[in-house]
Every structure is written in C-alpha cells, then in structure tokens.
Amino acid sequence: MRPLRSLFLWAAAALCLAACGTASDDAVIPHPASVEELPGSFRIHAPMALSVEAPVEAAEALTGYLKTTPLPIDTAEPDAAKNYLRLELSDDERIPASEEGYVLSVRPAGITIAARGEAGLFYGLQTLLQLHEQFGSRIPAQRIVDAPRFAYRGLHLDVSRNFFDKEFVKKQLRMMASLKLNRLHWHLTDGAGWRIQIDRYPLLTEVAAWRRGATWQQWRDGGAKYCRFDDPEASGGYYTKEEIREVVAYADSLHITVIPEIEMPGHSEEVLAVYPGLSCKGEPYSGGDFCIGNDATFEFLENVLTEVMELFPSEYIHIGGDEAAKTAWKECPKCQARMKREGLESVDELQSYAIHRIGRFLAKHGRRLIGWDEILDGGLAPDAVVMSWRGEEGGRTAAAAGHEVVMTPGGYCYFDGYQDDPTTEPQAMSGFLPLEKVYSYDPAPADMPGREYVLGVQANLWTEYIPTAEQAEYMLYPRLFALAEVAWCQPEGKDYGAFRERALRYTELARSRGYNTFDLAGETGERPESLEPAEHLAVGCPVTYATRWNGGYPAAGERALTDGLRGSWSYKERWQGFLGCDVDVTVDLGEVKPISEVSADFTQWYSAWIWLPARVEIEVSDDGNDFRRIAVVENDYPETAERPEYRTFGWTGSEQARYVRYHAIPNERVGGWLFTDEIIIN
C-alpha cells in the first residue's frame, strides 16, 4: 500500500477527532481537526527558549526556518521551564498516525508541538504562526490535534501562457506552506511558450520561449508566432537550471514537492515550430501534436525528460496527455505504419501507445507518470496516476478500476474563471467559480467506488487572461483558502459560514504580507435573478421548439424556459444553449389572456463564442396558426466586447393572446452560440 493512499485510509478512520470548525474564535486555515480550549494564555514577552528533539538535520532545518518567521526564539537555553517552544518527534499514541499530523499545546508556561514526522512539526508551526498573526503576543491556551484528510494537496501554476519569474513562484510557495498545501504542479511547457532550460535543445529557450506580444492574448491576435530572444519585440522567458534548483530546494524546505509538467503528445506548437521534424508534416506551424510514428520524437522526449529528472526529485513526472488533436496522425504515413506494426486500431490507441512508452521510460528511472484524464483513452498504463479535470467521471472511472487519481474538476478547481459578477470583474476565462462553490467540493464522497484511491485534490491556475503577478494572486486568493480546507478537513465538519469569517480575516492577513487578493468583503455574490423563482404567466406552460437546444446545455430540457428558474452568472447553470441556429419557441398560455410584457435574457461570453442575438422578433396568436408581430428588437451591443454581458430583449405594451412566439436570430458568426434562461410573460 502506498503512503499517499494509507494516509487517506487513516483520515477515513478520523482518529475520533472532532470535525473542522469547532472553535469560532480563531482564523487558522485550514481549520484544525480538534481544538480544546484551556484556561489562561501564553504571552510572548521575550525570545522563546527553543528546543528541538529530532535528528540533527531535521533540527537544523526547523531552527533555520523559525529564524525566518516573526516568532522570536533563543537557542541558548533549550531546557527552560517557562517561555519555551518545544518541538518533539515522538511515536506517542496520542499523536495522529500521519507523518503530517501534529499536536500543538499552548499553555501559560510555553508551547509544545509533537509529531511523528518532520512535516508534522512544520505544519504545527504553520498553525502557531497563524495564531500569532491573529492574537499577537498573547495566544489563548489550547490543545490542537490535527492531521490532513488527503496526502496530495496541490496547486497547479501555468507559466507558459504568461511567464512569471522565480520570485513570484517562491512567494506563492510561502502561501502554500501556510495553507499546508504540499504539491506545486508546475506547468512548464505548452503551445504558448517553453519555460525550462534544456541543454541538448537550445532552440527551446532561444526561440520557443519568446514571442511578440506582451500577453498571451496579444500574441494570439498577432498570429501566434515565436521569435528569437534577441528580437527587440521579444516577450517571454524561461527558468535556468540554476533557478529551477533554487525553487525546488526552497519548496523542499517548506515541505512542498514540485511536480514538473512537460506536455506531450499535444499542446506542443512551440516545440514543433523550432524542431519541425518532430511533427507529422515536417513543417513549422503545422500543428501541435508530436509525430508518434517518428522514433526521433521519442528520442527527443526521453532526452528532455532525462534533463528534467536531474532537476526534479519528485516521484511523479506530469506528461500532460490532454487535448491532442490526433488529426494529422490519421493521414501521416509514419503514424499509420506505427499503428500497423503495433496492432493499433485507432488514434486513441496510438496516443495510449505513446503514453505507455513514456511511462515505461520514467519507470526505468524510478519515477511515475501522471497525466490529465485523456490518458485513459485507449487504455491506461498500469502504474499511471490520473488527474481528473474534465469533470469527475475520469477520476471515478480510474479509481473504481484501482488506479490512483487526483481530483481537479474544472467546475470546482479551475481558478481562471470569474469569482464574482463577470460584468464587473477583470477579464477571465469563461466560467463562474465563487468561493462557496470551491468550498463545497468533496473529492471522495462516501458513495464513490474506489474512493481510497483518491490521493487528493488540486487547484489549477491557467493564465491565458492573467498577464501579471498581481492578477494571478487576485485569482488565487481567497479561493485557494477554500481549496486548502477541502484538502485538509474532514467533510462532515465543514461549515461555509464559519469558513467565510476565517477567510475574511485571513484575506486581510494575506494583504498585510503583500498578496493582492480579491475583495471578499465586497463580494457581489450570485446573479440576483437566479436567487428566487420568477413568477409570471408562463410558468409551467408548455413550450414548442421549432429549433431544439444543444444536448450539451439542456438546462431543464422542455421545461427550461418556463420553469421559473433564472440562470446564474455561469452560462453552464440554468441557461439553455443553442448552437448555430435560432432560438424559435412558442409558449402556450392555455387560453387567451391579457399580456403586457414578453422578454428573455441572453448572455454574451466572447471567450466561449457565445453571443447576444442579432435581433429578436416577438409574435402573438389567439389560435396558434395566425400570428401577428408585436415587436422587433435589434441588438446594439458590440460582438467584439470581451467582457461577459447579460441583456434583456423584450416588449411591453397591451395585447390579448394565448400563444406567444419568441424568435431570436443569431449573428453571422459561424459556430456561435445563443444562451437564454426564461421566457417571461406578464
């Protein structure tokens, strides 16, 4: 049994610990499992006498770390009877079995942290540091018994779409440590730029790391071309090997493992632009998929991974594996020859062949392959770990089959989407993920088959629309606080109201440390129209569709447009989607009635190819055969506006009718969507 999974099994037993959220007067995030209030308090009035009962290397590391914190310590009197801070490695049965668990005792005479492993002592210190931040020099006496639910508690950082320097990465590592997160998934390569020095292939950092256009969006708008590092308009960058060693060592000192991601076989436009012989067509800018039929592809990938493994001691190496187009493989003679030789019947199996081959290479070097859930396609390599991002189905499938998984579904864990009213927030990727929804996530619910194979959970920050360090932090915090509690706390004790109060306080603490956070205190919250059922004449009335909704966005199906339920800020919730066609529906009110209003809301999301209608036509009828037009509403909102928008298209007046036809005509963009949520009739 692997250590990560054994921790999950320990957490399931819960050690009879109380649920998260038992104390209302502290701001520790993630909230400890058990907090017992004791009489009195400990006053820090002078440097605390530090003693560390641990092997020399661990003792030196913990002492060195403490010297970088605001806690005053004195190493001259380790046996002091008061005003002490004692760190003890112990196998006492009262200490949680997890190497990351700890017991923190704050008493008037001093403070003791006991744990089975160095990581547990470190996390006990993180709790103490947060208590010190909140209470200052007088910390209430208490006994905390704590341990994590999951062993994998991660943050993914995309530095390809927009590059962030090593100091930014180290700053986020410090926050991760405070939140007891322990895995940084470093997305180092993608079509937007290569970010790691590889000595054997210098063009990766001389050209593939650079582009014209200060941001990902400007680069895309300019044709998505790369340039040499010495081009006057060059923008981008990469990490030298020395910088990577520095980051990895710094992370290790904070008990964080850095997992590198090298994308393959897709998302590799930047590689194929400078080494086009590795593509199926042999030409630059001809696609983003490596040629799997070419042995030179595997020579390149193995050489790159060899240098990567020299820099990263992580057990896991992430190879991407997502969103390969696979189109060129169908026509490529080399790929087709490979399929014939290997007895492969589909391009999915060809991708699986590539993943298996790379997995075997990593295994020879004592490493394990981890990849996005597309690595399930065509058959999963025996020892591979699945990172489930396209919802939860991939993770559930893998876990049920006995494969280890990390849950990171976009609907709960993708922090590149809007966290508040999209009409007022800075531009982001499509989607709406507020703090409360992040907090609500359970990566391994009780009814999930194979839940013991869920290693943990991860937040993902993709950076297409995040050009600056300040914006990256704005998108991370406080949502990463919620993810930290999802990863650490047992689900039965979670309480969003209590957490939000902690998050409000911790947001202020984060700002005092120099982090740029979202203003949680000023949060707008969910779209007001979605909070209460709408009351109007058409509620519950049958709707006839001349054009049917798209199966990917059905909302409530035939009832969606008259169920009284309005859409949220997210077009994925209660909005009905129509792809490449009109919205042409007729509502039957049951009998002729006086009407004074007909309207419907539409939303526009430029990044998701969702548009407001070009115009709306509204007609009424007494018998359902003869209709008279009562309104034509033209759209005056620009198609090029990139900020999400919500607009009402309707009519007011005085009419008598039983049938109301609402006809929305899309603009001329091929492949565009229309999204509406309710036909309001009064």
Question: Model-found features: residue ranges?
Answer:
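Bacterial N-terminal signal peptides that target proteins for export
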Residues: 1-9
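Feature activates predominantly on carbohydrate-active enzymes
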Residues: 95-316, 332, 357, 361, ...
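Active-site neighborhood of glycoside hydrolase catalytic domains
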Residues: 271, 280-281, 285-382, 389-396
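Predominantly extracellular/luminal regions of secreted and cell-surface proteins
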Residues: 532-566
